[in-house]
Structure formats: structure tokens, C-alpha cells
Amino acid sequence: LELEGLVLVIPRKGAEVADIKEKSLRDVLEVRKALEELSVQLACEKITKEEIEELKEAAETFKKAQKTKDITQIAEADVHFHDIINTASGNQKLIQLLNNLREQMYRYRVEYLKNPEVYPQLIAEHEELITKITHHEKQEATKIMCRHIDNQVEAVTDVIRTKKV
């Protein structure tokens, strides 16, 4: 956890959760953005009808989760949505890289999801992604995924700047 920047180990004191830093946020989300762009492009080419149905179900689960106001449940539903796209890419190395980033991204995702004002936008982006992936519209799906992650960067950066996370 220390190597991933999630925990600070303080000699003779123990460990504490590391603060989210803007630079760290940008670094992690730049990598995520590049990997998720590739993932959505490959998913547009390879997704099966079953995976499309799973994606639709995951989007519905996300909608239901956001009504609970349980941040953990909402974050897990969002992770599951993205996992289906990643699996549909069919690229095991890509999936592995995204899974390796998951813990680092989770903190940022949680901060982002603490603001219920972002939910309608997320739901719309998920629905747009499903439509574009279903119709194999690679360029449009990539644009939506980029916007989706850029919005997260912007929202979490605002949180970092206005308060200590």
C-alpha cells in the first residue's frame, strides 16, 4: 500500500492513509484514461450480445445503487460497469493493468461519487457508452470515455483544492 501511495508509514508511529494529491490524481487518471480508451475501442470490436446485456444490467444496478446513497455500493456498481467493458476488450494484459490500478483509482472514484450532483451525468455517460459500444462506434465511444474520465479528474481536483481529502 505504501508503494502505491495509499498509505504513509511513519517510523515509531504506524501507518496512516495518505492524502490525495492533485499530481497523484492526474498521474493515475492519465494512465486510466489511456487504458480505458483502448479498452472501449477493443470492446466496440469484440463485445458479445451477452456482454451488452450485462452492461445494460450493470447500468441499471448503478442507477439503483445511487438511490441508496451508499457510496461503497455506488462505487462498486461503477467499477462493475467498467469491468464489463474491460472484459469485453478480450485483452488479458490490458485487464490486468486496469485491475492493478483499481485500488489507486478507488479513492478518487469514492471522492467523485460523494457528490450526488454527478449521478445524472454518470448515468447519461454510461447509457451513451452502451449505445456507442452496441453499434460498434469506436470513435464516439472513445470520446465519451475520455469525457467520462476528464469529468472525474475535474470533480476530484475541485475537492482537493477546496478541502483536504
Labelled PLM ranges:
Residues 1-41, 45, 87, 153, ...:
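Short linear motifs at protein or domain termini
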Residues 2-8, 101-103, 117-119:
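Mobile beta-alpha loop/short-helix "lid" or hinge segments that flank ligand
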Residues 28, 32, 40, 46-111, ...:
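Conserved amphipathic alpha-helical segments that form helical-bundle/coiled-coil interaction surfaces
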Residues 113-115:
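A short, acidic/glycine-rich surface segment
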Residues 117, 135-136:
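Residue-level signal for the nucleotide or nucleotide-sugar donor/cofactor binding architecture
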